[in-house]
A protein has these predicted regions:
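All-alpha prenyltransferase/terpene-synthase fold signal
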Residues: 1-193
């Protein structure tokens, strides 16, 4: 039941993401709803199933589900930020993949919302151009990184990831100290490091 519900939510999230494709003018709340329905739902289901299989109480299962949800959001936000940086090569993701595919991520949403008319026009054109191929990808990507840095969008995305990583760790507070709790905390810290 947990996994089938998660699969339905993930499918809904995929549809929401496809509907937001090319549209940098979505709210941060709408973007967070998309990643809650995609990445966070998967992480939450995995953590919930782990609790069920371990025979945890309902309260403990809810705490694990909250841990997974917040960890999933943190993970996705870090992934969003890494798309515009060089560290991601270590993680096996090529820089600019999301940008090349026209995926609107939180850094783009924040930069668009904070940008002036020129910045917003850039994001509208660049996101559409990534889909239809009518662009100079390298020049657009360099400009995108500049806009993200100028508006503080990357730093704020990482700050939000850290916030959700901390919320994930906080969800584990009801569990007594143990090796498993320590490992889950370390996983959250690794995600946002």
């Amino acid at each position: 039941d947990v996994l089938s519900n998660a699969a339905a939510v993930i499918a809904e999230g995929e549809v929401m993401q496809l509907a937001a494709m090319r549209n940098a003018d979505i709210s941060e709340d709408n973007y967070l709803r998309i990643i809650e329905a995609k990445t966070a739902a998967l992480f939450a289901a995995a953590a919930e199933v782990g609790g069920i299989l371990a025979g945890a109480s309902e309260t403990e299962i809810e705490a694990l589900k909250s841990y997974g949800k917040n960890l999933g959001i943190a993970f996705q936000l870090v992934d969003d930020a890494l798309d515009y940086g060089s560290v991601n090569r270590v993680l096996g993701k090529n820089t600019g993949e999301d940008f090349r595919e026209g995926k609107v991520t939180l850094p783009v949403v924040l930069s668009y919302r904070r940008g002036d008319q020129t910045g917003r026009a850039f994001w509208e054109r660049a996101m559409s151009a990534q889909i239809d191929g009518s662009n100079d990808y390298e020049a657009d990507f360099e400009m995108a990184v500049q806009y993200l840095q100028t508006t503080g969008a990357l730093q704020d995305t990482v700050a939000r990831a850290t916030h959700f990583g901390e919320r994930a760790k906080d969800a584990l507070a009801l569990f007594p100290p143990s090796d498993m709790r320590t490992l889950l905390i370390q996983l959250s810290e690794f995600c946002i490091a």
